[in-house]
From Swiss-Prot:
Mg(2+) binds at residues 256, 280. Its EC number is 2.7.1.40. SUPFAM superfamilies: Phosphoenolpyruvate/pyruvate domain, PK beta-barrel domain-like, PK C-terminal domain-like. It catalyses: pyruvate + ATP = phosphoenolpyruvate + ADP + H(+). Transmembrane segments: none annotated. This is Pyruvate kinase. GO terms for molecular function: ATP binding; kinase activity; magnesium ion binding; potassium ion binding; pyruvate kinase activity. Keywords: ATP-binding, Glycolysis, Kinase, Magnesium, Metal-binding, Nucleotide-binding, Potassium, Pyruvate, Transferase.
Length: 526
């Protein structure tokens, strides 16, 4: 079987038949990865040169973790990322701000010393301020004032990612809970606390989060990864804080607790996208159930046509080792097969010894995992699940993807203002790349969230429109997009290109699909 020529034709088979035809000699027919890669920038990668090296390896989105670092440090990341983006004109690099989120922590022990505690030991957990700096094995302070109102006997309390666990015996009064320690460990200062199975009423944003979001608005970040989202109203609150100036910033809801899973449908209605944040989620719910939650959330995002990111510990061993474990590679591949639009690296690129190698490994794994996707079947299922009647833009996107599959097209080239049409095209998961051409700088960056989309920023200003000038401008942008795709090797000369455009300028008018050949001197307007 020819390695590259057979792939596109085989992908219309049923899933089991398609998988049975795979072999290790198969390679993608084009050097095109559909899944975007998000990388956290830390001290080891915070320079223009190192960010460019990560981009060469396959990075699409720069992430800043606001649980760590000063504003001065994060400003340097933004400045370095924007300087790095200038080296590839027209190829945008997105910037994401990951909030710390509201959290519960223990108090301080005397002199911040660890205090040993034995399994079976009973003590009080208290919100009394007198113990805020005097936590010990008799009274351990928590900074969540309402804990006595929401917790009940039999519930669990995890400290320091579950290293120390307690069972609630009794709610004594409005400040005190009697608990039993479930394992040997140490009571330490300022450790994070999880309350699995308990509906907490923490605010969506802390004061620090609000200040951080305003910093992001001032610096025109492209997306916010909002931590510990529990309900749809949390997203509305974040949107209010971002305000008019931050209206183009995409809000990605991080689902990290049982409440977020339980309220996922209402969150999905409000948010621009979702992150399956498996670290804290694996503490809040039993670890064997995390993969069920992951599959559910990714599937619902795919059906809704909203981007979804899979994150946490994906190639964690590469923080210190040059090669990942086989389980980690399978984890990345399975996230791609589940339908993730993006995968994310944290410590691997922020503090790891092998950041470039980690991005390259993730890129190669995604590229090969995409070979195993039966795209025709995925398209048919998504089309059948689409609500009826669909709006015009989604109908055109559906028709364009169908045409691209039937024609074995080299690419879909879409002209868009807001990126909405590109998002709908991405929803239906074409085999070929989606070459997005836009004049909107923000859309060109945040569209990295959409699987299969290669966004390009068109450099020419919008002309004063009449019908003739508008059509010439449309053809000029299409030709520009095709030529850039040819130069980058995304498509080949002679490929069929499905072009998607509007019938007039502005947002919301996409209604035209046409097919042209990929040629450098394409007979469109100059």
């Amino acid at each position: 079987m020819a390695a590259s020529s057979s792939l596109d034709h085989l992908s219309n088979r049923m899933k089991l038949e398609w998988h049975s035809k795979l072999n290790t000699e198969m390679v993608p027919s084009k050097n095109f990865r559909r899944t975007s890669i998000i990388g956290t920038i830390g001290p080891k990668t915070n320079s223009v040169e190192k960010i460019n090296s990560l981009r060469t390896a396959g990075l699409n989105v720069v992430r800043m973790n606001f649980s760590h670092g000063s504003y001065q440090y994060h400003q340097s990341v933004i400045d370095n990322a924007r300087e790095a983006a200038k080296t590839q004109v027209g190829r945008p690099l997105a910037i994401a701000l990951d909030t710390k989120g509201p959290e519960i922590r223990t108090g301080n022990t005397p002199d911040d010393k660890d205090i040993p505690i034995k399994q079976g030991h009973e003590l009080n957990i208290t919100t009394d301020e007198q113990y805020a700096t005097a936590s010990d094995d008799k009274n351990m302070y928590l900074d969540y004032k309402n804990i006595t109102k929401v917790i009940s006997p039999g519930k669990l309390i995890y400290v320091d990612d579950g290293i120390l666990s307690f069972e609630v015996l009794e709610v004594v009064d409005d400040k005190t809970i009697r608990v039993r320690c479930l394992n040997n460990g140490n009571i330490s200062s300022r450790k994070g606390v999880n309350l699995p199975g308990t509906d907490v009423d923490l605010p969506a944003l802390s004061e620090k989060d609000i200040a951080d979001l305003k910093f992001g608005v001032r610096n025109k970040v492209d997306m916010v990864f909002a931590s510990f989202i529990r309900r749809g109203s949390d997203i509305r609150h974040i949107r209010e804080v971002l305000g008019e100036e931050g209206k183009e910033i995409q809000i990605i809801a991080k689902i990290e607790n049982q409440q977020g899973v339980n309220n996922f449908d209402e969150i999905l209605e409000e948010t621009d996208g979702v992150m399956v944040a498996r670290g804290d989620l694996g503490i809040e719910i039993p670890a064997p159930k995390v993969f069920i939650a992951q599959k559910m959330m990714i599937a619902k995002c795919n059906i809704k046509g909203k981007p979804v990111i899979c994150a946490t510990q994906m190639l964690e061993s590469m923080t210190y080792n040059p090669r990942p474990t086989r389980a980690e590679v399978s984890d990345v591949a399975n996230a791609v097969l589940d339908g993730a639009d993006c995968v994310m690296l944290s410590g691997e690129t922020a503090k790891g010894n092998y950041p470039n190698e980690a991005v390259k490994m993730m890129s190669e794994t995604c590229l090969l995992a995409e070979v195993a996707i039966p795209h025709f079947n995925v398209f048919d299922e998504l089309r059948n699940l689409a609500p009826r009647p669909t709006d015009t833009v989604e109908s055109i996107a559906m028709a364009a993807v169908s045409a691209s599959l039937e024609l074995n097209a080299g690419a879909i080239v879409v002209l868009t203002t807001s990126g909405k049409t590109a998002r709908y095209l991405s929803k239906y998961r074409p085999v070929c790349p989606i070459v997005m051409v836009t004049r909107n700088p923000a859309a060109s960056r945040y569209s990295h969230l959409y699987r299969g989309v290669w966004p390009f920023l068109f450099p020419e200003k919008k002309p004063d429109f009449n019908v003739k000038v508008w059509q010439e401008d449309v053809d000029r942008r299409l030709k520009w997009g095709i030529n850039h795709a040819l130069k980058l090797g995304i498509i080949n000369k002679g490929d069929n290109i499905v072009c998607v455009q509007g019938w007039r300028g502005g947002m919301g008018h996409t209604n035209t699909v046409r097919v042209v050949p990929a040629e450098e001197n394409l007979g469109l307007a100059e």
